[in-house]
Amino acid sequence: MARARKKVPTKYRVITEAGAFADHEILMDKKPVYDELRSLVEPHLGGGRLMHVRVLCPLLDDWTDMFVDEMGALKRLPRNDAATRIFRNSFMSKRPDDDPEKLPYIAGTAVVFLRPVWEG
């Protein structure tokens, strides 16, 4: 018999390319499996396939997980400046002398979890 997995309150923020955001809270497994993350995240991405990005989140001042449409740039989705700042913050924390505009950007909607959820 399979053991029940522990569910914990989990907050996440959906950031649109227009800069608007919506905060959500759900109960999810403490260590969710890929399919659980996919079924939660991909609807926010307009059905796009999720791609994981480890980020240094300024809200938490700690490392956490962001998910974006893996084909966002190829689909020519609009640049998401708010998500790009979070994404680039990770690089700039380690390499402060780099030019941030030479780094990749986030295209389309992004989903940022306020706790680490990715085991990969």
Which residue stretches match the model-derived regions?
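Detector for the mature cores of small, proteolytically processed
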Residues: 4-39, 44-120
